[in-house]
UniProtKB/Swiss-Prot annotation:
Keyword Chaperone: no
HAMAP family from the UniProt entry: Ribosomal_eL13
BP GO terms, sorted: cytoplasmic translation
Protein name: Large ribosomal subunit protein eL13A
Keyword Metal-binding appears in the UniProt entry: no
PROSITE patterns for this protein: RIBOSOMAL_L13E
Family the entry assigns: Belongs to the eukaryotic ribosomal protein eL13 family.
Species whose genome carries this gene: Saccharomyces cerevisiae (strain ATCC 204508 / S288c) (Baker's yeast)
Length: 199
């Protein structure tokens, strides 16, 4: 919040010579260049391995953004298992695994299993040294597996106003889901009360 008017500064927990220790960000542009150079250096050092772990395709949360897909934190245990891997082994060959994520979408599940299988088909795994063959190092033939937005094929058609509102339909669907339990309970209690009256 900006300071306005000639009033005392509230909660002024300053110390002596605090002006000498103000944090400024005049190096923002320089830091950006430094980070870019560091990424390039690391990429050259670990080449031909990719910079980051393989991430899953996930659908963004909330009604506003759920039409888009993006990279997630890690593959679910079910996805890893369906691809014929174990979580511990997957982590050693450059695959991110997130034990907390749950699958609620069959399309995304299938896409991620396919992504894992494609990754497995393109990697070359060999022992890091002769003594410990279980410790692997990964060489990736294709370093990146980009996440593409699914194409939406929309055909041109005449505009029709049938009096239905997409917003209202979604709003009612959400409301119905939210209150389904309490409505069923009320209906059940009402039916029981009527049955009691008839007796």
């Amino acid at each position: 919040m900006a300071i306005s008017k000639n009033l005392p500064i509230l909660k002024n927990h300053f110390r002596k010579h605090w002006q000498e220790r103000v944090k400024v960000h005049f190096d923002q542009a320089g830091k950006k260049v430094s980070r870019r150079n560091a990424r390039a250096t690391r990429a050259a050092k670990i080449a031909p391995r990719p910079l980051d772990l393989l991430r899953p395709v996930v659908r963004a949360p909330t009604v506003k953004y759920n039409r888009k897909v993006r990279a997630g934190r890690g593959f679910t245990l079910a996805e890893v298992k369906a691809a014929g891997l174990t979580a511990a082994y997957a982590r050693t060959i450059g695959i991110a695994v997130d034990h907390r994520r749950q699958n609620r979408n069959q399309e995304i599940f299938d896409a991620n299993v396919q992504r894992l299988k494609e990754y497995q088909s393109k990697i070359i795994v060999f022992p890091r040294n002769g003594k410990a063959p279980e410790a692997e190092q990964v060489l990736s033939a294709a370093a990146t597996f980009p996440i593409a937005q699914p194409a939406t094929d929309v055909e041109a058609r005449a505009v029709q106003d049938n009096g239905e509102s997409a917003f209202r339909t979604l709003r009612l669907a959400r409301s119905e889901k939210k209150f389904r339990g309490i409505r069923e309970k009320r209906a059940r209690e009402k039916a029981e009360a009527e049955a009691e009256k008839k007796k």
